[in-house]
From Swiss-Prot:
<feature type="glycosylation site" description="N-linked (GlcNAc...) asparagine; by host">
    <location>
        <position position="353"/>
    </location>
</feature>
<dbReference type="GO" id="GO:0007155">
    <property type="term" value="P:cell adhesion"/>
</dbReference>
<feature type="glycosylation site" description="N-linked (GlcNAc...) asparagine; by host">
    <location>
        <position position="205"/>
    </location>
</feature>
<keyword id="KW-0946">Virion</keyword>
<dbReference type="GO" id="GO:0019028">
    <property type="term" value="C:viral capsid"/>
</dbReference>
<comment type="similarity">
    <text>Belongs to the orthoreovirus sigma-1 protein family.</text>
</comment>
<keyword id="KW-1161">Viral attachment to host cell</keyword>
<feature type="glycosylation site" description="N-linked (GlcNAc...) asparagine; by host">
    <location>
        <position position="21"/>
    </location>
</feature>
<comment type="function">
    <text>Fiber-like molecule that attaches the virion to the host cell membrane by binding to the primary receptor F11R/JAM-A and to sialic acid containing proteins (coreceptor). The interaction of sigma-1 with F11R is required for NF-kB activation and apoptosis. Binding to both sialic acid and F11R is required to induce maximal levels of apoptosis.</text>
</comment>
<comment type="subunit">
    <text>Homotrimer. Interacts (via the head region) with human F11R.</text>
</comment>
<dbReference type="InterPro" id="IPR008982">
    <property type="entry name" value="Adenovirus_pIV-like_att"/>
</dbReference>
<dbReference type="GO" id="GO:0046718">
    <property type="term" value="P:symbiont entry into host cell"/>
</dbReference>
<feature type="region of interest" description="Tail">
    <location>
        <begin position="1"/>
        <end position="324"/>
    </location>
</feature>
<keyword id="KW-0945">Host-virus interaction</keyword>
<protein>
    <recommendedName>
        <fullName>Outer capsid protein sigma-1</fullName>
    </recommendedName>
</protein>
<keyword id="KW-0175">Coiled coil</keyword>
<dbReference type="GO" id="GO:0019062">
    <property type="term" value="P:virion attachment to host cell"/>
</dbReference>
């Protein structure tokens, strides 16, 4: 490939790199095809040269054979050798030229590839530019449409404004022909407002109607609807169909009602009736001796002067039958108490569920304990029974209140057995009622025989105390 061809290729490449014509890719493809054809031609020439080299080698062998066989042909062979040498030199020069051409082609191929890459980039940029140009054309078309629309709308507004101005001119002419510029008698013009001059005795009502002002005039005259009328009290007066003032029916009946009252009037009263008047109120009253009579539930009753005797327990008055009898709660009455028996000591305390039998005999309350086994006790301490709850039906907490506060109220001996390691040791405890507070009864353990133990077996025992609460 000669220098002029390379120079021409470079010019074409430069023109393609600068040009933005969309046909550049086709021209590059044509160049690539032409280069490929040249490469193919060079390769075919190399193949032919290789064939010539082999033929020359064959000829050299033939010449050597001829030289060995034909000595007499030396001069001719020398001439042939010179020719062969020249041919060989020419072939070598051709080979070098072909090699140089191959190197130049190899150098051109990367540049052609680079040119292909640049061409691809140019193609992408050209496509982007074409897309941007298309978008600009679309926006320009939309803008053109909007401008056309706005121009049309402005034309419409201008036409409408011209019509409105024409209408305003016509209306202004009409106003000018009918406009009030001066006010006559009884009227006053204030700017664009025409006022009615109202003197004393006139006013505008809530409906903006001009009426007579009677507020400072005679009483009893006013307006009803659109007319002026005489004011009346409708409780006693009314207008008839002729507009005359008449009495209402209640007033018309007054004479007959007064006559009825006069016919039933009591002119005087006789004792024990009296008439009293206070603060304008007349009251008919019945006179009676308050020491003998009294008024109970608005009924005059005879006052009893008898003094009823008082009764002490066990007697009581049966007011229903007006008789004196022995109180129902006097005599013997039985019941039960079920709850927790509490043992209290500074060093020991426990609770046990028990049921006590109660018996009220005259003024004494008997507590009967059944046999039971409890936890251990100390040498003293106290047992507590709470009668606030647990009493059987018919018994009240107050029924257990002692009649005295002496400590102890009463005492008794309780037989017990102290249980210790399977042994039973007979003993007794001295028990006494010591205190009763708000339904809580305390039974003290005042002592007795005592020994170490783990449990206590209690034989049945009773204790009683005076209980004649009145």
């Amino acid at each position: 490939m000669d220098a002029s061809l390379i120079t021409e290729i470079r010019k074409i490449v430069l023109q393609l790199s600068v040009s933005s014509n969309g046909s550049q890719s086709k021209e590059i493809e044509e160049i690539k095809k032409q280069v490929q054809v040249n490469v193919d031609d060079i390769r075919a020439a190399n193949i032919k040269l290789d064939g010539l080299g082999r033929q020359i080698a064959d000829i050299s062998n033939s010449i050597s054979t001829i030289e060995s066989r034909l000595g007499e042909m030396d001069n001719r062979l020398v001439g042939i050798s010179s020719q062969v040498t020249q041919l060989s030199n020419s072939v070598s020069q051709n080979t070098q030229s072909i090699s140089s051409l191959g190197d130049r082609i190899n150098a051109v191929e990367p540049r052609v590839d680079s040119l292909d890459t640049v061409t691809s980039n140019l193609t992408g940029r050209t496509s982007t530019l074409e897309a941007d140009v298309g978008s600009l054309r679309t926006e320009l078309a939309a803008l053109t449409t909007r401008v056309t629309t706005e121009v049309t709308r402005l034309d419409g507004l201008i036409n409408s404004g011209q019509n409105s101005i024409g209408e305003l001119s016509t209306r202004l002419s009409n106003v000018e022909t009918s406009m009030v510029t001066t006010a006559g008698r009884g009227l006053q013009k204030n700017g664009n407002t025409l006022n009615v001059i109202v003197g004393n005795g006139m006013w505008f009502n809530s409906s903006n109607q001009l009426q007579l002002d009677l507020s400072g005039q005679s009483k009893g005259v006013g307006f009803v609807g659109t007319g002026m009328v005489v004011k009346i009290d409708t409780n006693y007066f009314a207008y008839n169909s002729n507009g005359e003032i008449t009495l209402v029916s209640q007033i018309n009946e007054l004479p007959s009602r007064v006559s009825t009252l006069e016919s039933a009037k009591i002119d005087s009263v006789l004792p024990p009736l009296t008439v009293r008047e206070a603060s304008g109120v007349r009251t008919l009253s019945f006179g009676y001796d308050t020491s003998d009579f009294t008024i109970i539930n608005s009924v005059l009753s005879l006052r009893s002067r008898l003094t009823l005797p008082t009764y002490r327990y066990p007697l009581e008055l049966d007011t229903a039958n007006n008789r004196v009898q022995v109180a129902d709660r006097f005599g013997m009455r039985t019941g039960t108490w079920t709850g927790q028996l509490q043992y209290q000591h500074p060093q020991l305390s426990w609770r046990a569920n028990v049921t006590l039998n109660l018996m009220k005999v005259d003024d004494w309350l008997v507590l009967s304990f059944s046999q039971m086994t409890t936890n251990s006790i100390m040498a003293d301490g106290k047992f507590v029974i709470n009668f606030v709850s647990g009493l059987s039906s018919g018994w009240q907490t107050g029924d257990t209140e002692p009649s005295s506060t002496i400590d102890p109220l009463s005492t008794t001996f309780a037989a017990v057995q102290f249980l210790n390691n399977g042994q039973r040791i007979d003993a007794f405890r001295i028990m006494g009622v010591s205190e009763w507070t708000d339904g809580e009864l305390e039974i003290k353990n005042y002592g007795g025989t005592y020994t170490g133990h783990t449990q206590v077996y209690w034989a049945p025992w009773t204790i009683m105390y005076p209980c004649n609460v009145r």
